[in-house]
Amino acid sequence: MNMMRTKAGLTLIETLITAFLLMAISIGIFSAFRQILVVMESIRTRSLATALANERLEIIRNIPYASVGTVSGIPAGVIPQEEDVIRNNYTFQVQTFIRNIDHDFDGTAGGFPNDTSPADNKLVEIRILCDQCQNYRTLAFTAMVAPKNVESASTNGSLFIYVIDANGEPVSNMDITLDNGMLIPEVHINDQTNVDGVLQIIDAPPAVSSYEVTAGKSGWTENRTYSSSDIGGSIPVFPHATVLQQQITQLTLVVDRLSTINIESVDEFCAPVGDFDFNLRGTKLIGTTPDVYKYDQSNATSLGGSLSLSTIEWDTYTITPIDSTYDLVGS
């Protein structure tokens, strides 16, 4: 008698299904392992950043109060405004902001009662950045530093910088640069407005028309102060700020988001006219006697008769033809 034997095995489809399942499981395990590594790296970098910030705060707590300030800052001191520090092969950018704070328990500068020494305490803010770290967000740490002795009347003043948009609304987190090369030591500050669109520089050294202020950031227009020499001898509409002893100087700068102007040059048959030369001028003045316009530039359309200007601020603009062949008929 012949006995028929059957051999157990896998068909091609079963083999493919098994291989697919094994591959899916392997990918899942690998992805989970990779995610664990990412989380561990994030925890490690945050721990390093936190330790670095605590180290900086401890240094500040142990230096004389008069030295608690930034190099070329207000208040002036021994702490660098920016510094790169390497820890465990990670390069961290350490930014230090130190501001004089005016508390209202003894009055405020310009208030009632008037505080003739408004620099009551110093607010220290340390930001730790890491460009090479994955899944890392900038960490910020703050601390308040107070003097041991009773304050005396200040011989300095205050500069309050307000930033608003075209609708008069305050603009928070606007980048502010403040420079004064006439003082000893010089002042060079990079900071931001608060939630109310204000940056208060308290206990600033007195100086006449020498505090240069600029407000602006990516995607926004820039507004700044000027000296007469910056604009060819005209009188600045927004001159460099003056700070007087025990007085508050208030400066308002208006900024808004950048816009785009698209210009096309065509003839009477609506055919493109290439390389058309024209002048584009806004109405905003940065100087008078004689007038100096904030935007006053000569431009030309492309060979296809078009031009796009993408870094334009809000204003009313006038087009004046300066082309040797064509004139402007309508708009």
What are the residue ranges of the model-derived segments?
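N-terminal leader/signal peptides at the extreme start of proteins
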Residues: 1-10
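Aliphatic-rich helix starts adjacent to a transmembrane/signal segment
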Residues: 10-54
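Low-complexity, Gly/Pro-rich coil/beta segments used as flexible assembly/activation regions
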Residues: 43-172
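Edge beta-strands of extracellular beta-sandwich domains
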Residues: 141, 220-231, 327-331
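Extracellular beta-sheet/turn segments enriched in Thr/Pro/Gly and aliphatic residues
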Residues: 152, 229-258, 262, 331
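Structural motif
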Residues: 160-173, 256-258, 263-277, 283-288
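Short, acidic Ser/Thr/Gly-rich low-complexity loop/linker segments typical of extracellular
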Residues: 181-203, 284-308
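Short Pro-Gly-centered beta-turn/loop motif in secreted/extracellular proteins
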Residues: 195-219, 299-325
